[in-house]
Design a protein with these regions (language model features):
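ATP-dependent adenylation/nucleotidyltransferase module used to activate substrates
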Residues: 33-208, 249, 265
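AMP-forming adenylation/ATP pyrophosphatase catalytic core
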Residues: 35, 147, 177-275
Length: 275
């Protein structure tokens, strides 16, 4: 299971209801003009730079860190700032691998780590064999994250790393996130959320740093493609992963979900023209 965000199926209406957020001059991303009192691009960019400076100070204050690393936008940015601030000897990014973690996302995580020299450790997680997780209840993510942080916290302690951190950001705080409880129980920190980083700010600072994940679509775990109450099995997750990979091979970009409904699949895409 990746350490980045994990969600159950989210209706399109809920996605459409998200309020517009000022874009920070990101390439190929349009700014919303839904609000009359938007901060100027220069002001918004300066605010993001100031937050990054405070993030570096946060890492310095702790001295060392283990990052739960999925290869998504948030954890990739977090790992790169930690590395720049603390150095390789005091930074470790850990990838939790299981059937719910797409191979394509693992490849992106390794690409970022290799490009920037982030020390990486991979561990296998065993949530698939937990009947509470496999039953796919509405708090499924709690059992996944309990397994993940239960494996990462001892690694941090054994290596003398002061804190374990995840990539939760300020925009995540209003979401349904049962995994956040598991993180709190294990003493996991969320510095991006603590410092008020929005997703757009993280994308902007990632672009400025040349981190290739800056415009990457969100990628919840594969189990989120199954309706709550539908048992999570390795076979079902593999079918979803293969279907999404086949669609990507056709040139589909942006957000993509293949929702599993037994003999039926529903495909969710970003709106826009198709070729």
């Amino acid at each position: 299971m990746p350490a980045g965000r994990a969600h159950g199926p989210r209706p399109r209406a809920a996605l459409a209801a998200r309020r517009p957020i000022a874009r920070l001059g990101l390439p190929h991303r349009e700014a919303s003009n839904s609000f009359l009192a938007m901060p100027s691009p220069d002001h918004a960019a300066a605010d993001a730079v100031a937050k990054e400076s405070r993030l570096a100070d946060w890492f310095r204050a702790h001295g060392s860190a283990l990052i739960g690393f999925s290869g998504g936008v948030d954890s990739a940015y977090l790992a790169c700032v930690a590395l720049d601030t603390l150095g390789a000897a005091h930074t470790l990014a850990v990838i939790g691998r299981s059937a719910s973690y797409p191979a394509a996302q693992w490849a992106r995580a390794r690409e970022v780590a290799d490009r920037f020299g982030v020390p990486v450790l991979e561990v296998d997680t065993d949530e698939m064999n937990d009947p509470r997780y496999a039953a796919n209840p509405v708090n499924r993510c709690y059992f996944c994250k309990s397994e993940l942080w239960g494996r990462l916290a001892p690694i941090a302690a054994a290596r003398g790393l002061a804190v374990v951190v995840d990539g939760t950001n300020a925009d995540d705080l209003g979401d349904h996130r049962p995994g956040a409880q598991a993180a709190r129980e294990r003493g996991v920190h969320s510095p991006l959320a603590e410092l008020g980083f929005t997703k757009d700010e993280i994308r902007a600072r990632s672009a400025a740093r040349g981190i290739p994940t800056w415009d990457q679509p969100s990628s919840p775990c594969l189990s989120s493609r199954l309706p709550y109450g539908t048992a999570v099995t390795s076979l079902r997750l593999r079918r979803v992963e293969e279907a999404e990979a086949a669609l990507r091979a056709l040139g589909i970009e942006g957000n993509l979900r293949v929702r599993y409904f037994g003999d039926l699949a529903k495909v969710e895409l970003d709106p826009g023209p198709r070729t």
